[in-house]
Regions:
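Conserved Class I S-adenosyl-L-methionine
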Residues: 257-274
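Conserved alpha-helix/loop element of class I SAM-dependent methyltransferases that forms part
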Residues: 121-139
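Conserved beta-strand signature within the Rossmann-like core of class I S-adenosyl-L-methionine
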Residues: 242-250
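N-terminal auxiliary segments of SAM/dcSAM-dependent transferases
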Residues: 2-101
């Protein structure tokens, strides 16, 4: 079982929205100080607009024309003196840390598929709704399958979990978590991140080790093994008797075949869940 140590990559995150105040500045004054919302709404900084250049607190100077070109669909981070777009193409997959609102946490998009619900809510609200389904977590030991950006593991700790073990298969996903200010809570000592295939990792866990299990996998077409009877059997084995499982399968209204939900329910019942 491979332990992953989370380390946040320092640097301000900018979006098209966060620099709108700068873009709107008219150069009436030779120099103007502008307050900018950064880190997807978590922080504010002051920058100096000097003609056609913008000077950030660390002294980095960026042309105003370049800031004007930032796309609403991307996030950018000031890392080691340069502004880097937060996307990646790796091993046939395209990853993007996607802004969804001016002051809301981002979602992770993989090959065009968002990892959170963003219609009439933001990724954090989506997470809170799901985690709340587990009920009170104070003092409990929680297994969190599919770390993603870490929002669910962070929310579980905020709800009082004594310890959270969260499992993520894709190192690129954890890389984007290291760039995301909203994921910084993953450095909490109560959270243990395991890098590995959940199918194999669960086999190494003790029986009846967890008070609650949070299972929010990618859609079935991307990770069918996480919906299998065999995997559900492992979830049942590691969950204490009387413990609670939350399993998100997507919005039922979006399933063209209701038999999918019925199949999930049947397999869960077959391994012992009620």
């Amino acid at each position: 079982m491979q332990r992953y140590v989370y380390r946040y990559v320092e640097g301000y995150v900018l979006t098209r929205w966060s620099v709108s105040n700068i873009i709107a500045c008219t150069s009436v004054k030779r120099e103007e100080v502008v307050e900018v919302v950064v880190d997807f709404g978590l922080s504010r900084i002051s920058v100096r607009v000097m003609g056609k250049e913008v000077v950030f607190p660390e002294g980095l100077t960026i042309p105003l024309d370049y800031l004007s070109s930032l796309s609403e669909n991307f996030a950018y981070k000031l890392i080691n003196g340069s502004l880097q777009r937060l996307d990646l193409f790796s091993e046939g997959k395209y990853y993007k840390l996607k802004p969804v609102a001016p002051t809301a946490p981002p979602t992770l998009e993989i090959n065009g598929v968002q990892m959170h619900r963003t219609t009439e809510m933001d990724p954090w609200k989506d997470t809170i709704i799901k985690v709340s389904a587990l009920g009170p977590l104070k003092g409990k030991n929680v297994l969190d399958v599919c770390t993603g950006l870490g929002y669910s593991a962070i929310a579980e700790v905020l709800k009082g979990a004594r310890h959270v073990t969260t499992v993520e298969k894709d190192p690129n996903v954890l890389y984007f978590a290291s760039l995301n200010p909203w994921s910084r809570g993953l450095d909490d000592e109560r959270i243990r991140i395991v890098l590995g295939d959940a199918v194999e990792v669960l086999k190494e866990l003790e029986s009846e080790e967890y008070d609650a299990v949070f299972h929010d996998p990618p859609r079935y077409s991307l990770a069918g093994e996480l919906y299998s009877r065999e995997f559900y059997s492992e979830l049942y084995r590691v969950l204490k008797r009387g413990g609670k499982l939350f399993h998100y399968t997507g919005e039922p209204s979006k399933h063209s075949n209701i038999s999918f939900i019925k199949g999930v329910k049947r397999r869960l019942e077959e391994v012992g869940f009620e």
